[in-house]
A protein has these predicted regions:
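Conserved N-terminal beta-strand and adjoining loop/helix that marks the start
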Residues: 1-17, 39-40
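Unchanged
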Residues: 39-67, 77-135, 139, 162-167
Length: 167
């Protein structure tokens, strides 16, 4: 199992996203997604560590530092039956989601992950994204915290195995 974090920074009707660069073995290659990435082993051990991981990943990818992010949810990306063009049977990925409404810093023009952009909330559903990410954005629109599972069979979202429970 892998562990990661994602940050949902929403300011004045716009959401901070990354247009990912195209690369092999990246399920988000060429897609739009939230800033985030793998947690370091010491960050996984506590809520504070996971929060610091979200702040770190967002700053690395976008140049922006989240102010007072709050925990929003946790998603298990159930990947054992998932396939990509050149990547068979990836590991499950447990992702902690944090939300912020304020930030400091200057937006980078690009990073190793892609191009950070402010996207109008009304446009997000029209962007090229992973099926699982589209489901995650639906859950984030609700103001409640959540626990979710996103499951794929092959390269298709398995709706019957995908679920959310609001807390």
């Amino acid at each position: 199992m892998k562990y990661g974090t994602m940050s949902y920074l929403s300011v004045d009707g716009k959401v901070l996203m990354i247009q990912k660069i195209k690369r092999e073995n990246d399920p988000n290659s060429g897609y739009y997604t939230l800033p985030g990435g793998k947690l370091k082993p010491y960050e996984r051990k506590s809520t504070q560590g996971r929060l610091e991981g979200a702040i770190r990943e967002t700053k690395e990818e976008t140049g922006l530092r989240l102010i007072n992010p709050v925990f929003r949810g946790i998603i298990l990306f159930h990947n054992r039956e998932r396939t990509f063009d050149n990547w068979k049977n990836p590991q499950d990925y447990l992702v902690y989601i944090f939300e912020a409404k304020k930030y400091t810093g200057i937006l980078k023009s690009s990073s190793d992950e892609g191009i950070p952009l402010w996207i109008d909330e009304t446009e997000i559903s029209n962007l090229p994204q992973n099926h699982g990410d589209k489901k995650m954005y639906e859950w984030l629109k609700d103001s409640r915290n959540f626990k979710g599972i996103i499951k794929h069979r092959g390269n298709i979202l398995d709706e019957s195995g995908t679920s959310v429970r609001y807390l």
